[in-house]
Amino acid sequence: LFRSSDYMLAALASAVLPNLGVAGVRENVQASATDEAKGIDQTVIQDASGKLYDVYATDTREGRTRLIRRVKAAQTLAAARELGGLGFDMDRVVAFVPGDVSQPGQTATAQAVRQQAQAESTPLTPRKPGPTGETTVMIAVHRDGQARPLDLLTLDDCAAVGTAIGAIHRLPSTFLANAKYPVVTTGQIRSQLTVWIRRLRSAGHVPQEITDSWARIMDTEGLWSFSTCTVHGGFSDGDFLFSGSTITTVTNWQDMQVNDPARDLAWIFGKLDESHRNAVLSAYGRMMGSDRK
């Protein structure tokens, strides 16, 4: 059953790409709870030649920010040569329209300065309205697969997830540094945690025996023997798309960076029971232990 919003999204896609020739809409089986919570609608459209495209649209500030960052990440990944042979697809953006709104994330002061500069410019050039009004729209090549809640993954799904995360963590990180994404070292993580514990002690909001326990853990031998690496940034429902138990696509790379590999594994302790966690970690360990090529 198609929703009225599916046809609205198809109309927006036609406004963004008038030559696309939208012929219809398809059932969307890749809905993301995270996108929905931020006010992002999604549908699948088909053009006259049978090609499929994913269309995302939002009128909310949080949704705009998420889509803008997602597009930037997709463009960075598309330009990176290091990503060959991952074994799964990623977002491939065809078109993007940010909408006729102030830039998401821009402070009120920055907006005021921009508006003042525009007001003082002579002659005043009227701003040409965009094709989608205030609606932010992203169109991407449709990716095969179905979204699956992380807490409903099978053991085979979990093994595929562990392998995929390992493949991500083995990626050279140069492309992230070149694109100005965050690059954090192990030493910086330790320093940040040390400062955080010190501040908690000073504030007195946390019992001293707890902060003392954390400080002792910080000094545990071997705790800081890991190396930071390329990370996705943390997974939510809908970030993995599956065909059977094979991962076809990993999406939503907007938080990618060089950081603690645990960032990509933390979710398993809140979403999976022990046997499913072990399936993820075993596959991940095999991937990370294999010889680098």
PLM regions: where:
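An alpha-helical support segment within catalytic cores of ATP-dependent transferases
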Residues: 5-20, 115, 120, 173-232
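A conserved alpha-helical element in kinase catalytic cores
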Residues: 6, 10, 59-134, 150-163, ...
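Conserved N-terminal boundary motif of the eukaryotic protein kinase catalytic domain
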Residues: 17-32
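Active-site acidic catalytic loop and adjacent metal/ATP-binding pocket
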Residues: 35-47, 217-263
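ATP-binding glycine-rich loop module of kinase domains
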Residues: 39-72
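A glycine-centered beta->alpha junction motif in the catalytic cores
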Residues: 99, 108, 112-121, 132-152, ...
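Active-site Asp-x-Gly
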Residues: 243-291
